Amino acid sequence: WKGNEMSVQTIAVVGAMEQEIELLRESMANVKHVSFGKFSAYEGELAGKRMVLVLSGIGKVNAAVSTSWVIHQFAPDCVINTGSAGGLGKGLKVGDVVIGETVAHHDVDVTAFGYVWGQVPQLPAVFASDKNLICQAEKAAQVFEGAAVTQGLIVSGDRFVHSSEGVAEIRSHFLDVKAVEMEAAAIAQTCYQLEVPFVIIRAVSDSADEKADISFEEFL
């Protein structure tokens, strides 16, 4: 994929929760509801492109299954993962946007066999978002007035981080981490394995600390 906007005809957007995809769904024309097993997706048109919105559900397995399905079923030119995240980067506040330049699992440990923390055997230690898609995301995010837009490392794991101890543990493995959430690394790994360009875009909903659950609910 050369990053030529005209060549992109089909875009898949994966979101874990209804609140994370409903604005896009309301903006689409000719929307069709598609279900596969227990998963839901919406196919439609937006800005002259074919869009497929997938409601993945929460967590890495849900994210991987639904991303794999949408790639197999709709052959998208790229995959966008959108949603919320706990902000760990310095100075990040609720509403700021983090573009996942790189993405890693924070709860994978195969260090006994010489892999780095977070690395799945035989795979890269981090997965990189497509550079052209990062540029497009950076431009698109400028519409959020008052929100800072930053790029960096987003880490994922199957737990909602809501304590300073949890944050400290993640930082001990990933010094330059910007945000933490529960799906991005699985989506990135799926796209890497199936050779589809992707970008991860997350809005900060909380600071992954003791007030995270309250802040997260308010943000949604």
Where are the regions that the model predicts?
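Short active-site-adjacent structural elements
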Residues: 162-164, 188-189, 207-213
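Regulatory input/activation interfaces that engage signals or partners
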Residues: 143, 198, 203-220
